[in-house]
UniProtKB/Swiss-Prot annotation:
Acidic residues bias (residue ranges): 41-58
Subcellular locations according to the entry: Cytoplasm
Domain spans labelled GIY-YIG: 82-160
Protein name: UvrABC system protein C
Lineage of source species: Bacteria, Pseudomonadati, Pseudomonadota, Alphaproteobacteria, Hyphomicrobiales
Organism of derivation: Nitrobacter hamburgensis (strain DSM 10229 / NCIMB 13809 / X14)
A single GO BP: nucleotide-excision repair
Subunit structure: Interacts with UvrB in an incision complex.
Main location per the UniProt record: cytoplasm
GO CC annotations, alphabetized: cytoplasm; excinuclease repair complex
GO molecular function, one term: excinuclease ABC activity
Function summary: The UvrABC repair system catalyzes the recognition and processing of DNA lesions. UvrC both incises the 5' and 3' sides of the lesion. The N-terminal half is responsible for the 3' incision and the C-terminal half is responsible for the 5' incision.
Keyword Cytoplasm carried by entry: yes
HAMAP family: UvrC
Length: 690
C-alpha cells in the first residue's frame, strides 16, 4: 500500500544549495519510529519458533467436571442476549479459557450445554469452565473485530493464537524537508511524506532502501546530520547519495531524483527504467562515458531490486496471499505481500493451535487477528475456504474504509500465487520441524553430559561487561527447545554505586539477585501458578544457568543461590581454554569433577554458541550505554580536548557520530589535532569493553 501523510504546517525553507529557491515541501514535526537503514537489525518475534502443541488427552473426561461446566453454561444461557456479542469462558481462577463471538449469543452458548456430540477439545474446555462473561455488540462484524482483539490481548488457551503483534515496516520518503529523506518507518503514519508498504521484514526494507539509494541517490541521513554538514559524507563518495547537503546537486536535480524513486515505488518501474536507459544512451552518444556509467549502475540497482522480488504479478495490483500447511500437529501460515504490482516480501507464521483444529479453522482465526492492528489490502487470497469469509470481508471493509475482497481463487494467476505461497508454507514448516528436532537432540545430549534429570526447557546464560567499572551492564539470554528466545533476553544496568571497579563477582551477584528475587516474589504472590509453564510453554524458571568463567565464578554463584534458598536450578561455568582457544573449554559443575569435551562434540559447540551469544548481547548493550553516555557528555571526557579543538572537530565532521566513526588518519587532518591527539580520540571511542 502507498499512502500519503500531509501536514498543513508552513513549508520549511531549504538549506540554500544552488537552485533551491523558495519552492519547498510542507513542514511538520517528525514523529513515529524512523530508522536509519544502516542500523536495521533482524526482526525477532514469537513466530520465529514453533509453539508447544501438547498431545490431546485420550482419557474420557470425568462426568463431574463436565456437569459443573455445563451448569455454569446453562446459567449463562438464561441471561444471555439473542443479539450479537462476544463471550469469555473462564475457569475458577478467572483465567480466560476461550473467547468466542456469535450472531446469537444465547444460541451459541446453548450448543455447549448439549450432553453429547462434543469433540474432545470442546469437552475439556467445558469441564474447565466456571463462569462466562458476555459483551453485547451492535453487529456481528463488530463482534468479529472485538473477538480478534481480545484473543490477541488475553491469549486464551483454547483459541488459535497468532503470537505476534509487531507492526510491519514501511519505506517513508519524507515530505517535511526541501531535500526528502528515505528511511524505514514503523508505527503511526503521522510524519508528512509518502509511505510504501508493508514489507515482510526490516531486512527486506533495508535491502530495498540500499538498492534505491544506489539507483536514485536519495539521502538517508537525519535532518540534524544533514544540516550540520560542511562536506559530503561517505555515502556521496560511494555513489549512494547525491550530496544535496553541501550543494553537490541543486534543488531541481534532487527533486527529479526523488520523483523517480517515488514513481518506482508506486509501480511505474518500467517508465523509470526506460527514462534512465534513454539518458544513458544520450550520455554515451555525447561521449560522456562517466555519466553514462552512472546511469548504467542505477539501472543495475533497479534490476537488482526486481530480481529480489521474485514474482511480480501482471493482474494483481494490491493483495495479501495466505496459504496454510499442517504437519506433525503444527500449522504454518505463509503470507506474501503485493503492492503496486510488486512483491514486497513474504513471511512464515506458526500460530498456536491444538491439533484438532482444521486448516480452515486455523486460517480463519489467524486472519481476524492478523488484521486487528494492520490495514488490509483490497484483495485477500486464500489457499483454503474459510467459514464466514463474507463476514470477515465486511468487517475488514469497515475497518479499512474501502471494499476488501476475501477470495479463494480457482484459476489463473491468482491461483498460481496461492500455489506458490502453499509451497513456501510447506517448505517453511519442514525446515522448522527439522531445526526443532536438531535442537531437541542437542538439549538431550547436554542433559546427558551434565547429568540433568531431563532435557532443559529453559536455559539462561549470564555475562557482564564494563570498562574499568564504568557503564557496567549485565545481560541474560534464553534458549530452549525452539532455539534462542530473543524476545526474552534481558539487560541489567548495574545500579550499585559502591562496587570496586572491575569486580565481576559483585556485578554478577547484583544481576542474579535481581533476576531471582523477582521470580521468588512472583512465586510468593501466586504459588499455585509458580510452577506452571507460561503460555507458549516457556517456563519462568530456568532448568540450567550458565555463566562465563571458571571455578571461582561457579562458587560465587553457588553462594548467591544458597543465600536465596535456590536448589532446583542447575549451575554450570564455562572456562575458556589456554590462549582462549575455542574447543578447549572446561565445564565446571558443583561437587563434580571438571568436564572436558572433544573439540568436535556437538554439545560443546552448542555450549560455545550460547556463551558467544550472551557475550555478543552484553557487549552490544554496553556499547549502547557507553555511546549514550558519550553523547550526553560530548567531547568533554576525551583527554586533552579543550573547547577550541572540540569546535574544530565538530566543524570538520559535523556530528559527534561522525567523529566516533573517523579513523586516526581522518582525525589527524583536522586543524589543531596532532597525531597523538588523534590517537587519543580514536582510542576513547574504540576501547574494547571488558
Amino acid at each position: 500500500m502507498t499512502t500519503d501523510s500531509s501536514d498543513p504546517a508552513k513549508p520549511a525553507g531549504p538549506g540554500q544549495p544552488p537552485g533551491s529557491g523558495a519552492d519547498t515541501r510542507p513542514g511538520g514535526l517528525a514523529t513515529g519510529q524512523d530508522v536509519d537503514p544502516a542500523t536495521i537489525e533482524t526482526d525477532e518475534d514469537d513466530e520465529a519458533r514453533l509453539p508447544d502443541v501438547p498431545d490431546e488427552p485420550t482419557d474420557a473426561i470425568a462426568e463431574g467436571p463436565l456437569a459443573v461446566g455445563r451448569a455454569a453454561i446453562e446459567h449463562a444461557v438464561r441471561h444471555a442476549p439473542t443479539s450479537p456479542g462476544v463471550y469469555r469462558m473462564m475457569n475458577a481462577a478467572r483465567d480466560v479459557l476461550y473467547v468466542g463471538k456469535a450472531k446469537n449469543v444465547r444460541k451459541r452458548l446453548s450448543s455447549y450445554a448439549r450432553p453429547t456430540g462434543q469433540v474432545m477439545r470442546i469437552a475439556r474446555m467445558i469441564a474447565a469452565t466456571s463462569t462466562i462473561e458476555i459483551v453485547s455488540t451492535e453487529t456481528e462484524t463488530e463482534a468479529l473485530l472485538l473477538e480478534a482483539n481480545l484473543i490477541k490481548q488475553l491469549r486464551p488457551r483454547f483459541n488459535v493464537q497468532l503470537r505476534d503483534d509487531k507492526s510491519f515496516p514501511y519505506i517513508l520518503i519524507t515530505g517535511d524537508h526541501w531535500a526528502p529523506q528515505i528511511l524505514k518507518h514503523r508505527g503511526a503514519q503521522s510524519r508528512p511524506g509518502r509511505y510504501f508498504g508493508p514489507f515482510a521484514s526490516a531486512g527486506a526494507v533495508g535491502r530495498t532502501i540500499t538498492a534505491l539509494q544506489r539507483a536514485f541517490l536519495v539521502r538517508s541521513c537525519t535532518d540534524s546530520f544533514f544540516e550540520g554538514r560542511t562536506r559530503p559524507c561517505l555515502l556521496y563518495q560511494i555513489k549512494r547519495c547525491a550530496g544535496p547537503c553541501t550543494g553537490e546537486i541543486d534543488f531541481p536535480g534532487y527533486t527529479a531524483l526523488v520523483r523517480e524513486a517515488t514513481d518506482f515505488l508506486s509501480g511505474r518501474s518500467r517508465a523509470v527504467k526506460e527514462e534512465l536507459a534513454r539518458e544513458m544512451e544520450k550520455a554515451s552518444g555525447d561521449l560522456a562515458f562517466e555519466r553514462a556509467a552512472l546511469y548504467r549502475d542505477r539501472l543495475a540497482a533497479l534490476s537488482a531490486i526486481q530480481s529480489q522480488q521474485g514474482i511480480n504479478p501482471r493482474t494483481v495490483e494490491e493483495a495479501d496471499v495466505f496459504a496454510i500447511h499442517q504437519e506433525g500437529g503444527y500449522s504454518c501460515v505463509e503470507v506474501f505481500f503485493f503492492r503496486t504490482g510488486q512483491n514486497w516480501g513474504n513471511r512464515a507464521y506458526f500460530p498456536r493451535a491444538e491439533k484438532s483444529f482444521t486448516p480452515e479453522e486455523v486460517l480463519g482465526a489467524f486472519l481476524a487477528q492478523f488484521y486487528d492492528d494492520k490495514p488490509p489490502p483490497k484483495v485477500i487470497l486464500l489457499s483454503h475456504r474459510i467459514e464466514e469469509s463474507e463476514l470477515l470481508a465486511d468487517a475488514l471493509s469497515i475497518k479499512a474504509g474501502h471494499k476488501v475482497g476475501v477470495l479463494m481463487p480457482q484459476r489463473g494467476e491468482k491461483k498460481e500465487l496461492v500455489a506458490h505461497a502453499l509451497t513456501n508454507a510447506r517448505e517453511a514448516l519442514g525446515r522448522k520441524l527439522a531445526d526443532t528436532a536438531t535442537q531437541s537432540r542437542l538439549l538431550q545430549g547436554l542433559a546427558t553430559v551434565l547429568g540433568l534429570p531431563h532435557a532443559p526447557r529453559r536455559i539462561e546464560v549470564y555475562d557482564n561487561s564494563h570498562i574499568q567499572g564504568t557503564n557496567a551492564v549485565g545481560a541474560m539470554i534464553v534458549a530452549g527447545p525452539e532455539g534462542l528466545l530473543k524476545n526474552q533476553y534481558r539487560k541489567f544496568n548495574i545500579r550499585s554505586e559502591n562496587l570496586t571497579p572491575g569486580d565481576d563477582y559483585a556485578m554478577m551477584r547484583e544481576v542474579l539477585e535481581r533476576r531471582f528475587k523477582r521470580l521468588l516474589t512472583q512465586k510468593a504472590a501466586d504459588p499455585d501458578k509458580a510452577d506452571e509453564p507460561e503460555k507458549d510453554a516457556v517456563p519462568q524458571w530456568p532448568d540450567l544457568v550458565i555463566i562465563d568463567g571458571g571455578l571461582g565464578q561457579l562458587n560465587a554463584v553457588r553462594g548467591i543461590f544458597d543465600a536465596l534458598g535456590l536448589s532446583q536450578v542447575s549451575l554450570m561455568a564455562v572456562a575458556k581454554g589456554p590462549d582462549r582457544d575455542a574447543g578447549r573449554e572446561t565445564l565446571f559443575l558443583p561437587d563434580r569433577p571438571a568436564i572436558k569435551l572433544e573439540p568436535r562434540d556437538p554439545v560443546l559447540y552448542f555450549i560455545q554458541r550460547l556463551r558467544d551469544e550472551a557475550h555478543r548481547f552484553v557487549i552490544g548493550s554496553h556499547r549502547k550505554l557507553r555511546r549514550k553516555d558519550i553523547r550526553e557528555a560530548g567531547l568533554q571526557e576525551v583527554p586533552g580536548i579543550g573547547p577550541a579543538r572540540k569546535r574544530a572537530l565538530l566543524h570538520h565532521f559535523g556530528t559527534l557520530k561522525e567523529i566516533e566513526r573517523a579513523s586516526v588518519a581522518d582525525l589527524g587532518k583536522v586543524p589543531g589535532i596532532s597525531a597523538e591527539s588523534a590517537r587519543k580520540i580514536f582510542d576513547f571511542f574504540h576501547t574494547r569493553p571488558g
